[in-house]
Amino acid sequence: MKQQENQEDLFMAGVLYGVGVGPGDPEYMTLKAVRLIRENEVIAVPGPVAEETVAYKIAVQAVQELADKELVPILMPMTHDRAVMEQNHDEAADTVEGYLKAGKNVVFLTLGDPTVYSTYMYVQKRIEERGYHTELVSGITSFCAAAARANTSLVEWSEQLHVLPAVHKLDSELDLPGNYVLMKSGKKMGQVKEILRRSGRDVVMVENCGMDTEKVYHSVDEIPDDAGYYSLIIAKEAKE
């Protein structure tokens, strides 16, 4: 009997949507992302104060009524401590589950695309393990948008593309065939620039892609050592 009640509760439960809002320009948001934000009242936003997060500031420009929704801040601290991360992801899932149990959908905003290095996925996995339905809504990735802003391609013909998530894991000399994307490269820019110079690759960097403070640099020498957190580098094989 209890199992039947649990199944009925899940049948009546809300759905968790992981919605990508793109890298910065609200015009990059998809029609589906805009519709889901408009149609649902509970919006989860990664950060201690929802209104101060980058994801919220992007989305509210495209969906002004977002300001009147029930905003749920979700703490996602930047840490490499596995135990701390696990605890925060569990607590985030607990918060989301409270709304799903009450039959409310939750739209969880995430920068770029939720399938690319998004902490949202850790929450989704926990929600799915608890038996709830989830759905991913694609957004434009930062590296696709950055390539467009730099007016260049990422790959052509049969070229390979290597996407590296963070500079602290950059321990190679970029010597694999194909082109590289270095995400969130600002923390150790001096080290990154030296590796780029040695590689002999053609380099472009977009800082704060799609935002009011966006800047595009077309060579290693142009890139400042104090570039910001949202700095994305595209390093392409030099053309002979």
Residue ranges and their predicted role:
Residues 16, 174-240:
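A contiguous loop/helix-start segment that scaffolds small-molecule binding in enzyme catalytic cores
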Residues 84-92, 149-152, 175-179, 217-222:
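Short, surface-exposed amphipathic charged segments that create phosphate/polyanion-binding patches used
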Residues 76-82, 169-171, 211-213:
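A short acidic, often aromatic-flanked loop/helix-cap motif at beta-alpha or helix-coil junctions
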Residues 45, 72-75, 136, 156, ...:
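Structural signal for conserved beta-strand scaffold positions within catalytic alpha/beta enzyme cores
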Residues 115-176, 224:
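Class I SAM-dependent methyltransferase SAM-binding "motif I" and its flanking Rossmann-like core
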Residues 50-52, 79, 141-144, 211-213:
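Short gly/pro/ser/thr-enriched loop/turn and capping motifs at secondary-structure boundaries
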